[in-house]
Amino acid sequence: VEKTGCKNVCMSGGYFLNCVSNTFVQKHLPKDVNTFIEPICGDDGISIGLAKLNYYSKILSRRKFPLKDIYFGKKQKINIKGNKVSPKDVAKLLSDGNVVGIFQSRSESGPRALGNRSLLYDPRDPYGRDKINKLKGRENYRPLAATVLQEHAHKWFDMCGLEESPYMLYTLDVLSDKVPAVNHVDNTCRVQTLKKNFNKHYYNLIKEF
């Protein structure tokens, strides 16, 4: 940025799955610099990049492909017997201390669970992290991530100049003591901010909760 004067910076590669370093970069860049991190920035994203490169180099088209979400995985169906549940029903289950699994539509591309293949739990439970880590067979110090509605993100987290964090690529300082399950030892949390047009069903669930 200093050498080129460029105000638009795009970052990619497996290194940029490191949320701590991403936040460091965000905090130390000038405020007028726009940043974008490719959310599928590991090896699995190379095929997408090569396909786009080939498209633009061979077809010479100016057509753009805006990134609306990263639910590019296979759409699967499971035949199970049960009753349909509303966002209100699921919110009640969470408030009662239950772990809820979400399995809907296409799976997420990349390593982050963003509401289509996710485990949910009440972040207000001070023992929530231990409970989920035990359930997943992980070390007890492993942090949990949080999803927050876009319009309320600044109330709960220090967004350090970011307008949004839809792909869970930053660790942000927690501003409230009401969500201990997602508050790591350094007072940060890996955050997904959520808009309705990104994932309508997941948005409605979080809003109801």
Segments and roles (model prediction):
Residues V1-V9, Y202-F209:
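Phosphate/ATP-binding catalytic cores across multiple sugar-kinase/actin-like superfamilies
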Residues G5-G14, G101:
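Short glycine-rich phosphate-binding loop at a beta-alpha junction
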Residues L17-N18, N22-F209:
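Flexible beta->alpha loop and helix N-cap segments adjacent to enzyme active/binding sites
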